[in-house]
Amino acid sequence: MPETPITMPAWLQRGMVDLFPSGQWGDADQQLATRLDEAREQNRPLRVKLGIDPTGRDIHLGHSILFRKLRAFQDAGHTAVLIIGDFTARIGDPTGKSSTRVQLTSEQIEANATTYLAQLGQGQSAEKALLDFTTPGRLEVRRNTEWLADLDLPEVIGLLGTATVGQMLAKEDFGNRYGSGVPIALHEFLYPLLQGYDSVAVQADVELGGTDQKFNVAMGRDLQRHFDQRPQFGLLLPILAGLDGVQKMSKSLSNTVGLNEDPLSMYSKLEKVPDALVSSYVVLLTDLDPEALPVNPRERQKAMAIAVTASRHGIAAAEAAQNDAARLVSGSQDDAASVPEAFLSDVNFPAKAFYLLSAIGLCASSSEARRQIKGGAVRLDGEKITDPNLEFTDSSLLMGKVLQVGKKTFRRLTR
C-alpha cells in the first residue's frame, strides 16, 4: 500500500501563494511537509531565512506579513534567521525599481537597522513582540557584512560566474530597463547573487519572500547547489495592497499603516479599507478565520479593523479604539452631522498645524496649539498630528475632515 501523504500544517499554508522548487504545487507541498517531518523526527529545527535591507526607518503592515510567517515558524519550534542586509543595502535591491537606487552610508544603514529591530520587538517579551527574541534557539539576527565584506576579488568573480547576463535580463525589472534603454549599473547585477549567497552563508532550509522576490530566492537555491548544499525551499507571500486598494502598501504612496501606530490611528485607517481587501487583510494580518466575518460590508470592515488592531495592541485596546473612533466621528452625539463646524475661509494658506488650531479657535493661542500637538492630543480624521509645523497647502485638503483636540473637542472643517 502507498504511504499516506504527509499533510502540511494550516499555519504554513495560510496566505502562501507560491512554493518551490517544484512547478507542481502538490509536489513542493509534499516535499516541504516531508522536510518538516524529518526535522521533527531528528530534533533538528529548520533554518528559516528572511532578509531585510534597512533602507528606511519605518516598518508598516505590508512588511509585517513576512515577519508574521517567520514568527509562525518560530512558534512551531524552528529557527528564524533574520538577516540585516547592512552590506546589500549599500547596493539596494533593484526589484521593482526603474532606475538605480541611491546608495546609503554605513551610518544611515545602522541607524535604520536599530529602529527596525526595536519595532520588531527587541527587548520586549515574546508575547508582545512580533518576533520571538527571547526563547533560546528561536532567532538568529545576522548582518551580511559578516561574510560579504570578506569576499575577495576571485570569490566575487566566482559568484559572477554562476549566472549569465541572459539570466539577469530575464528578471523583469532588468529586462524592462534594458528594453527601454534605461541604464543598469553593473553592481546591480550583483544584488541577486549576494542575496543568494546569504542563503549559503546561513545554510537556509527555507527562505521567505514576497512574490516579487522569486528570482532572488531562486538564485539562493542555485548557489546552494553550486556550493554542495541542500537547496532551500522558496515560500512566497503576496504583496499587500495599500489603503487605497489599488497599489502596494508603500510609504511613498501614503497608503500605509505603521506597524506600531497607536490603536486609534490604526483602527481608523483600517475600517476604511475597501471591502474587496477585507478578506486578504484578515488572512495575512491576523489569525481570524475569514469565514467568521460578518456578511454586511460595513461590519466586515469593522471586524477586520478590530482583528488587525488587536493583533498588535490586544483586544481591549482595539475595542477602545473602535469606541473612540465612533466618538470622533459623532462628537459623542447622535450623528456625524451634529459635530460643530469650523470654517476655513479666514485661514491663510499654506497653514501650519499650530496656526490652524488657533485660527479656527480650537486652541487659545499658537503656543497652546504647539503644546497640544507635542502632547499627542491632536488628531485629524483619527490620525495623530505630531509635528506643529506640519503644513497644509490648501483648504481643499482639509474639507470635511474632523479635527480633534483632546478626547471631547471636535470640529468638522468646512468653508
UniProtKB/Swiss-Prot annotation:
- According to its UniProt record, the EC number is 6.1.1.1
Give the residue ranges of motif 'HIGH' region. Answer: 54-63
Pfam families per the UniProt record, alphabetical = S4, tRNA-synt_1b
Output one GO MF annotation. tyrosine-tRNA ligase activity
Cross-referenced InterPro entries: aa-tRNA-synth_Ic, Rossmann-like_a/b/a_fold, S4_RNA-bd, S4_RNA-bd_sf, Tyr-tRNA-ligase, Tyr-tRNA-ligase_bac-type, Tyr-tRNA-ligase_bac_2
PROSITE patterns (alphabetical)? S4
Query: What GO biological process terms are annotated to this protein in UniProt?
Result: tyrosyl-tRNA aminoacylation
- Per the Swiss-Prot or TrEMBL annotation, the motif 'KMSKS' region is positioned at 248-252
Position of the signal peptide = none
List, alphabetically, the GO terms of the cellular component aspect.
cytosol
**Annotated residues for binding of ATP:** K251
Task: Please give the catalytic activity noted in the UniProt record.
Answer: tRNA(Tyr) + L-tyrosine + ATP = L-tyrosyl-tRNA(Tyr) + AMP + diphosphate + H(+)
Where the record annotates domain S4 RNA-binding, the positions are 351-415
Q: Does the keyword ATP-binding apply?
A: yes
* Alphabetic keyword roster: Aminoacyl-tRNA synthetase, ATP-binding, Cytoplasm, Ligase, Nucleotide-binding, Protein biosynthesis, RNA-binding
Q: How does it assemble?
A: Homodimer.
Q: Which PANTHER family match?
A: TYROSINE--TRNA LIGASE (PTHR11766:SF1), TYROSYL-TRNA SYNTHETASE (PTHR11766)
Family (UniProt): Belongs to the class-I aminoacyl-tRNA synthetase family. TyrS type 2 subfamily.
Q: What is this protein called?
A: Tyrosine--tRNA ligase
Which gene is this protein's source? tyrS
